[in-house]
A protein has these predicted regions:
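Conserved RNAP core-binding helix
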Residues: 59-67, 83, 105, 203
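DNA-recognition element of transcription regulators
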Residues: 41-50, 75-95
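DNA-binding alpha-helical recognition surfaces that contact promoter or target DNA
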Residues: 67, 84, 91, 233, ...
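Amphipathic alpha-helical regulatory segments at dimerization interfaces
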Residues: 51, 68-71, 88-95, 129, ...
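Short boundary/linker motifs that mark transitions into or out of structured domains
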Residues: 1-44, 100-108, 115, 289, ...
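Intrinsically disordered, charged and Pro/Gly-enriched terminal/linker segments
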Residues: 38, 74-78, 108-333
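Short amphipathic alpha-helical recognition elements used for nucleic-acid or partner binding
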Residues: 36-69, 89, 215
Length: 333
């Protein structure tokens, strides 16, 4: 997925355990024997697996699956063909997942356990955590949101056909992906990464020409880089694309942003909670750790001095910490 940004995802996307199914791209099954993902062969197999994963833990009636695989005008042999596809897919899942396969119910089929994990679940969890962290720590929010986007390998449920279940879920996930992408750039702006965001949003607005939020973020990024005229030019470009593409004018939020930029509204330059605050917090924490380490070193020096001087005849009382500190102050002063 070209929109996935280059945020580090080692601590957010790794170490969480493998998911049973991957749907953020071609649908795949995690093979517990080999530790790899495998894909069903054939378009109907992928469409069947996609539909069952979308409704994992729920009974899917045979009629609905027939409609998913063959549309409004299924062949007369669709019921028998569905049974054959289920049998082949069941063998694949039993080999890959063990007992967590397809079960036959009175009215249809159920895939595995209700809690079957997918990469879509992981994506939504990371995205939610990123949004929840945005106000307090935009740097961390950007890491989480970047990790969520890095899970995408292509179009959701790619190759699973255009049946209503798979197509509807793919559309829902794509909207969540774009919303997460927009929130990622909000986090970057809050963290003070204006020039970087302005460059990348130029490309993203070209790829998604009717996403007003992306234009809004690009205008703010450019303005904070001191490029007011370019920011206003983005508004005109957005307006033209919206009129040509959808036949509508920009919404109130984008118009308000244009007016604010035109009149240099103070709110545009009021710094959001940015990276400097969090970097300062990190620096303070590192300083505290260093002070503790120095204190331990000082205690070790005191013990060594006392050990060295204890055997010397006529030696006075042991060196005390306060005295050593005073000596250090005298040297520095």
């Amino acid at each position: 997925m070209d929109d996935t940004m280059d945020e580090s995802v080692n601590e957010t996307a790794a170490g969480t355990g493998e998911t049973d199914f991957r749907v953020l791209g071609p649908v795949e099954v995690f093979d517990r024997r080999t530790g790899t993902y495998v894909a069903p062969s054939g378009a109907k197999q992928r469409a069947l697996l996609g539909a069952l994963v979308v409704r994992a833990g729920q009974v899917l009636p045979g009629e609905r699956l027939i409609h998913e695989l063959w549309g409004e005008r299924p062949p007369a042999s669709a019921a028998n063909a569905l049974q054959a596809h289920v049998a082949r897919l069941r063998r694949l899942l039993q080999q890959a997942l063990g007992e967590d396969g397809i079960s036959t119910q009175a009215t249809g089929y159920t895939l595995g356990r209700p809690g079957a994990r997918t990469d879509a679940h992981h994506f939504q969890e990371l995205s939610s955590r990123g949004r929840g962290t945005l106000a307090a720590n935009p740097v961390r929010a950007a890491e989480l949101l970047g990790g969520a986007l890095a899970l995408w390998r292509g179009t959701a449920l790619e190759g699973s056909g255009q049946g209503p279940l798979c197509a509807g879920e793919a559309e829902r996930l794509e909207e969540l992906r774009l919303t997460t992408l927009e929130t990622l750039y909000e986090a970057r702006l809050r963290a003070g990464r204006h020039a970087e965001a302005a460059r990348e949003l130029e490309r993203l607005t070209a790829r998604h020409p009717v996403r007003e939020r992306l234009y809004d973020l690009q205008m703010l990024a450019l303005y904070r880089c001191g490029r007011q005229a370019e920011a206003l030019g983005v508004y005109e470009r957005a307006r033209r694309r919206l009129v040509e593409g959808l036949g509508v004018e920009p919404g109130p939020a984008l118009r308000a942003r244009m007016e604010a930029i035109l009149h240099h509204a103070p709110s545009l330059t009021t710094p959001d909670p940015d990276a400097s605050l969090h970097e300062l917090g990190g620096a303070i924490a590192r300083l505290g750790t260093r002070i503790e380490a120095l204190a331990r070193e000082q205690q070790g020096l005191i013990r060594r001095l006392n050990s060295l001087t204890s055997g010397v005849t006529g030696q006075g009382p042991p060196v005390e910490r306060g005295h050593l500190l005073e000596q250090g102050a005298d040297v520095e002063g």
